[in-house]
UniProtKB/Swiss-Prot annotation:
Native source species: Oryza sativa subsp. japonica (Rice)
Transit peptide (residue range): 1-52
PANTHER family linked: 4-DIPHOSPHOCYTIDYL-2-C-METHYL-D-ERYTHRITOL KINASE, CHLOROPLASTIC
SUPFAM superfamilies: GHMP Kinase, C-terminal domain, Ribosomal protein S5 domain 2-like
Name this polypeptide is given: 4-diphosphocytidyl-2-C-methyl-D-erythritol kinase, chloroplastic
Sorted UniProt keywords: ATP-binding, Chloroplast, Isoprene biosynthesis, Kinase, Nucleotide-binding, Plastid, Transferase, Transit peptide
InterPro entries in the cross-refs: GHMP_kinase_C_dom (IPR013750), GHMP_kinase_C_sf (IPR036554), GHMP_kinase_N_dom (IPR006204), IspE (IPR004424), Ribosomal_Su5_D2-typ_SF (IPR020568), Ribsml_uS5_D2-typ_fold_subgr (IPR014721)
GO cellular-component term (any): chloroplast stroma
Length: 401
């Protein structure tokens, strides 16, 4: 099985490199120095030695030559082939639901859905390092309140990978969190998918992408989606993933506006009334969006009414964004179970988000649609940035013991 291609946004460090300067590439020496003994004018090569005789001076010259460039390049190539990686940095992007239909309730208590999921350019960065421990992973993060124990989906994903493959790698992980929690953006699910991808890289890609996708459904319904190529029609609980041929254009901008309050997914589903959901066939919505692009009518989210019951201020926020729209947004809708409101068509939020004190703690970010190639992980666009008033969540470190 071919190992996956690593992107520019990912850092790989081979083992057993004596020269730190060569840690990110091959050893290369530009000079080919030699050791010279004596002097002379005429020389001939024999077994790596240059021996020259001078009749006039009655002396012999011996010159020992080392082709250091070739020697060390060969050694570096051997190290690159045999060494594993010890550290890896990966981008962990979130997603939005361009439309979300709830089509029924299952006997197991879950709901069936049909949704167009799409990865976007807002995301976290996760740094993985091999740990000498053979019993425990160690997770740290820059945000207070994010669990760093085995309840975190990153740790669950690493435990799942070891269970499925029999590998025994444990890790130090640092999560640089930019995606807000309780936002309906799938940040935790993306982190879990990224951890599975990373564990597979450290193990020499012994599992296929299809296997990673299938395994991931055991710990979260949204996780399998991130093993698509970035745009997929998802059904079942979300774990049935079908890549779509025509992802939405990467140059179509959007703005994300999330109030500080979160929506409880469980509470939103508890208030859902199937008789009040849209009756539009989700395949009709999919065809409309993939063929004709984003429109307000096509961006249906059946979870909006119950989410607005849970958080009435979210309904007011959506209405104000629509009212302030001067043709900038093709559609304004809630992602997932909330509480993020998405405006497609412009990266700029309405002015009231900055001017009104009621929204002073609101998270705001511009974003664009994002995809990936098969056997490559997502890479962060250079232009991605956060634009909230505080820029990032509080920089409070917490580390598991």
């Amino acid at each position: 099985m071919a190992c996956s291609t690593h992107l520019l946004s990912q850092s790989l460090y081979p083992l057993n490199r004596a020269n730190p300067a060569a840690a990110r590439g091959h050893l290369r020496f530009q000079a080919s120095p030699s050791v010279r003994l004596g002097s002379g004018t005429s020389r001939r090569r024999a077994l790596g030695l240059r021996v020259a005789a001078s009749a006039e001076q009655g002396r012999r010259q011996v010159e020992v030559e080392y082709d250091l460039q070739a020697k060390f390049n060969k050694l570096a190539d051997q190290i690159d082939q045999n060494a594993g990686i010890t550290r890896l940095n990966l981008f962990s992007p979130c997603k939005i639901n361009v439309f979300l239909r709830i089509t029924g309730k299952r006997p197991d208590g879950f709901h069936d859905l049909a949704s167009l999921f799409h990865v976007i350019s807002l995301g976290d960065t996760i740094k993985f390092s091999l740990s000498p421990s053979k019993s425990k992973d160690r997770l740290s993060t820059n945000v207070a309140g994010v669990p760093v124990d085995e309840s975190n989906l990153i740790i669950k994903a690493l435990n799942l990978y070891r269970k499925k493959t029999g590998t025994d790698n444990f890790f130090w992980i640092h999560l640089d969190k930019k995606v807000p929690t309780g936002a309906g953006l799938g940040g935790g699910s993306s982190n879990a998918a990224t951890a599975l991808w990373a564990a597979n890289q450290f193990s020499g890609c012994i599992a296929s992408e299809k296997e990673l996708q299938e395994w991931s459904g055991e710990i979260g319904s949204d996780i399998p989606f991130f093993f698509s190529q970035g745009a997929a029609y998802c059904t079942g609980r979300g774990e049935i993933v079908e890549d779509i041929r025509n992802p939405l254009p990467a140059n179509l901008p959007m703005v994300l506006v999330k109030p500080p309050e979160a929506c409880s997914t469980a509470e939103v589903y508890k208030r859902l009334r199937l008789e009040h959901t849209s009756q539009t066939d989700p395949l009709v919505l999919l065809k409309e969006i993939t063929e004709n692009g984003i429109s307000q009518d096509a961006c249906v989210n059946d979870l909006e009414p119950p989410a607005f019951e849970v958080l009435p201020s979210l309904k007011r926020l959506k209405k104000r964004i629509i009212a302030a729209n001067r043709g900038d947004y093709d559609a304004v809708f809630m992602s997932g179970s909330g509480s993020t409101i998405v405006g497609i068509g412009s990266p700029d939020p309405p002015a009231f988000v900055y001017d009104d004190d009621d929204y002073k703690d609101t998270f705001v970010s511009e974003a664009c649609f994002l995809t990936r190639n098969e056997n490559e992980w997502y890479r962060e666009p250079i232009s991605s940035k956060i634009t909230s008033e505080e820029d990032l969540p509080p920089e409070v470190a917490s580390v598991s013991d």
